Amino acid sequence: MSVKYIFVTGGVVSGLGKGITAASLGRLLKARGVHVTIQKFDPYINVDPGTMSPYQHGEVFVTEDGAETDLDLGHYERFIDENLSKNSNITTGKIYWSVISKERKGDYLGGTVQVIPHITNEIKDRIYRVGKSERTDVVITEIGGTVGDIESLPFLESIRQVSNEVGRENVMYIHVTLVPYLGISGELKTKPTQHSVKELRSIGIQPDVIVCRTEKYLSQDMKEKLSLFCNVPEGAVVQNLDAEVLYEVPLMLEKEGLAKIVCKRLGLECKEPDLDEWEEMVRRQKNPKSSVTIGLVGKYVELHDAYLSVAESLRHGGIGNDVEVDIRWVNSEEIENGEVNSFLQGVDGILVPGGFGDRGIEGKINAITFARENKIPFFGICLGMQMAVVEFARNVAGLHDANSSEFGETPYPVIDLMPEQREVDEMGGTMRLGVYPCKINENTLIKGIFEDELIYERHRHRYEFNNEFRDTFIKNGMTLSGLSPSGKLVETIELKDHPWFVGVQFHPEFKSRPNKPHPLFKDFVRAAYEYKTK
């Protein structure tokens, strides 16, 4: 059977949830025995989001093979429960970089390099490459941005050409659009969707399905109107209401018949969907037996998407324990002067996630001190682990001016730049990225959580525990519970005299799934609930 291609575009406004729609469709097709992979094209000129501000872009999601990608890839992996690769996130910057490099090598034989055909051919090559490199029946491709944006035009032209090259029977276009509700008149308005589809058709793409994001139910008359003006079958107008919980969206789209429409349109051999596990997971999330409050201490907390995978992983841990996780977002800058108690009083656990730069660092250290002294479950990730090391050095080991060398001169650089990073000049894509093994020591909390001796986790860092201080930390009560197989890199730390105090250099949030919570997040939430009920 030929590989099938589904393209998901967006109209009217950005932020409608194209990524969630694509991921949900992937889950529904996988439930029918279809092998699915997903990719996203982003129209910005950055090569990847690795050097972009979290305030502009949200979190950077890291794949197994070390690609720094859009946060939507996190949604894709969590929904379809598959590991994606660097081929799954392509930017305008990557496309132009590749084309210009080929031109410099003389690959175009002296021809004039143009958007059509050279840029569009490069885009199509990235689409086909995923279909060839992955064992897949269907490639779902999300086109970032909004129809009508000048930046998206080469991508839209490329996906138009794909249908000519592989056959219209092997291609499907899904357009996600907004049907706004005007409270003053009590009406849903279809005109924005009509104009968005008109714009899409003007460049040669006729959508096969329109997914309507709306806060109110679409009436049958409304669906008939959209069908008429947008030239799609009436049954292909799918409503996508606001969901109570994120992972309910696939079930809502299943009721709307989206996957059946896709299977019929593309001629896919689909079995009856097996969504029992997913339905049970959603039921558990919507009906918790209790709740815990986790204080998430970071410097980008105004934009929750900056910590999207961490927040979702906490919720996964909650599902695994049948408790609801309420996240208390704490700006680390606001607790730099010692006002910790008023911000963290009453929390059942404290999590300090990853990050870069010295802004808000002292607030994170204050939060860690609060967790350590009050025996509150603590979880430090990447920079969070590093700051736990600094806090311990200052307040337990007697190294009062200890710090990370990332933040300036210090007599005790307990966190230091990795040796292989010392000669690196460029910022983008040069960190220790992707999956690396970690060997867990016996008789440790981490060993009890994982059971396995060797685990594989994703990383994104330049700095590490300074081995010159190992003996000092061990002597003062810190356990270095996980190391790289060579024994050179400290991967995990914990405290002997604390019920649950764990720091990890890696990013476990990138491997957590709603139906398969990461063991660390699941046990952290368990410990938080135990702390609450003791």
From Swiss-Prot:
Supply the alphabetized keyword list.
ATP-binding, Glutamine amidotransferase, Ligase, Magnesium, Metal-binding, Nucleotide-binding, Pyrimidine biosynthesis
Q: Which residues bind CTP?
A: 14, 149-151, 189-194, 225
Identify the enzyme class: ligase
Kindly state the subunit structure of this protein.
Homotetramer.
Q: How is its activity regulated?
A: Allosterically activated by GTP, when glutamine is the substrate; GTP has no effect on the reaction when ammonia is the substrate. The allosteric effector GTP functions by stabilizing the protein conformation that binds the tetrahedral intermediate(s) formed during glutamine hydrolysis. Inhibited by the product CTP, via allosteric rather than competitive inhibition.
UniProt cross-references to PANTHER family, sorted A to Z? CTP SYNTHASE, CTP SYNTHASE-RELATED
Q: What does this protein do?
A: Catalyzes the ATP-dependent amination of UTP to CTP with either L-glutamine or ammonia as the source of nitrogen. Regulates intracellular CTP levels through interactions with the four ribonucleotide triphosphates.
Domain annotation Glutamine amidotransferase type-1: ranges: 293-534
Protein name (record): CTP synthase
